[in-house]
Amino acid sequence: MSQRSSELFERAQQLIPGGVNSPVRACLGVDSEPLFIARAAGSRLHTVDGETFIDFVESWGPMLLGHTHPEVTAAVHAAVDRGTSYGAPCEDEVVLAAKVVDALPGVDMVRMVNSGTEATMSALRLARGYTGRTKLVKFVGCYHGHADPFLASAGSGVATLSIPGTPGVPESTVRDTLLAPYNDLAAVKDLFALHGKDIAAIIVEAVAGNMGLVPPKAGFLEGLRELCDQHGALLIFDEVITGFRVSFGGAQQRFGITPDLTTLGKIIGGGLPVGAYGGKREIMQRIAPCGEVYQAGTLSGNPLAMAAGIATLDVLSRSDYAGLEARVSAFVKELEAILKGKGVPVRINTLASMFTVFFTNDPVTDFASAKTADGALYTSFYKQMRAQGIYLAPSPFEAAMVSFAHTDDDLAAMLDAARKVTF
């Protein structure tokens, strides 16, 4: 019984809208209350009630090394002693920028910001400023943060709470957002046939992670690249989730597709608030102060986040991505077999160190098919796994994450818990 968590949640609801600072954390999508965390280490979360959970959420993606990795925490401790914010450039900004540029094929220059939302909204402004066009192609169910242009048919918490858009976003703002189903290249071609001369950019999660995990079909990303080249539009890869996760060089390295602009977040801050956007030099040089497209931030390039990011990328650069992916692949096959043995419809999508359990018999290739999965079955699964110390995303529209800190025993514990689930 999570008594202290319940007490804190009740108090939080009097002070914070919904009791949380990001909607999906409220656990409304799984008919539960949130757990309040006291500390975390490795693959474990420890609650204010003294409970311990094996964490398959990883703070929604940043903790690929696990919680409180010693090299990352040492770097942050050292940075704190040097000052928490300067409002001026520091050496670590240059060091982290160089690491990002070296790792990602599509990034010649990079600008640090404070969140993935800042990164995507800044990249869109830059794309519009560079091309002189206004329209944006995005995909139904993909989530690119909570900036106004991206909230049309978005995924993540918007999907979890069944919000079709959001009040407060003028129709005039989303009028320039053109929608297509994810993985549907023909639909994108139709949009370009109608609006090609006005489209500034396509923004896409190269691997969708906010409608649950949905990998791109063969030829989909290549087709987007070709359409942008044909029509003079920019291709923006939202790699806030996939950057440094699906390979050290992100989805663009894994799939061999070079975008014009890339947005980053999560992993590059090692768990501290951070975001970034980068791309081709000729495009990035249009950003102020060397260009006319304005973007700024008081805490951008924060020394604590830069130190954490440097340490995180240093460790990841020598980590065994292939080994982790092989372990996750074998684990997912066994998990799927266990759940199918219980007589429920189930498909598990997986790529690299991510997976999503969809309770459906049909392939999940876009948001429409993701929504056909049985939400009640997911809620039951979530509750029973949580009761056994397994912490999964409190939403059927989020990806589960495995970190380098997860041991074979951790994965075995999840499988054992799944065997005890009843439907």
UniProtKB/Swiss-Prot annotation:
Cofactors: pyridoxal 5'-phosphate
Classification via InterPro entries: 4pyrrol_synth_GluAld_NH2Trfase, Aminotrans_3, Aminotrans_3_PPA_site, PyrdxlP-dep_Trfase, PyrdxlP-dep_Trfase_major, PyrdxlP-dep_Trfase_small
Keyword Cytoplasm: yes
GO biological process, one term: protoporphyrinogen IX biosynthetic process
Protein origin, superkingdom: Bacteria
One Pfam match: Aminotran_3
Subcellular location, principal: cytoplasm
Pathway the protein acts in: Porphyrin-containing compound metabolism; protoporphyrin-IX biosynthesis; 5-aminolevulinate from L-glutamyl-tRNA(Glu): step 2/2
EC id: 5.4.3.8
Keyword field contains Ribonucleoprotein: no
Keywords, ordered alphabetically: Cytoplasm, Isomerase, Porphyrin biosynthesis, Pyridoxal phosphate
N6-(pyridoxal phosphate)lysine: modified positions: 266
Class of the enzyme per the UniProt entry, highest EC level: isomerase
One term under GO cellular component: cytoplasm
Coiled-coil portions: none
Record GO terms (molecular function): glutamate-1-semialdehyde 2,1-aminomutase activity; pyridoxal phosphate binding; transaminase activity
Swiss-Prot/TrEMBL catalytic activity: (S)-4-amino-5-oxopentanoate = 5-aminolevulinate
Compartment(s): Cytoplasm
Similarity section: Belongs to the class-III pyridoxal-phosphate-dependent aminotransferase family. HemL subfamily.
NCBIfam families: hemL, PRK00062.1
Subunit field text: Homodimer.
HAMAP family the record matches: HemL_aminotrans_3
Name listed for the protein in its UniProt record: Glutamate-1-semialdehyde 2,1-aminomutase
Organism: Nitratidesulfovibrio vulgaris (strain DP4)
Gene that encodes the chain: hemL
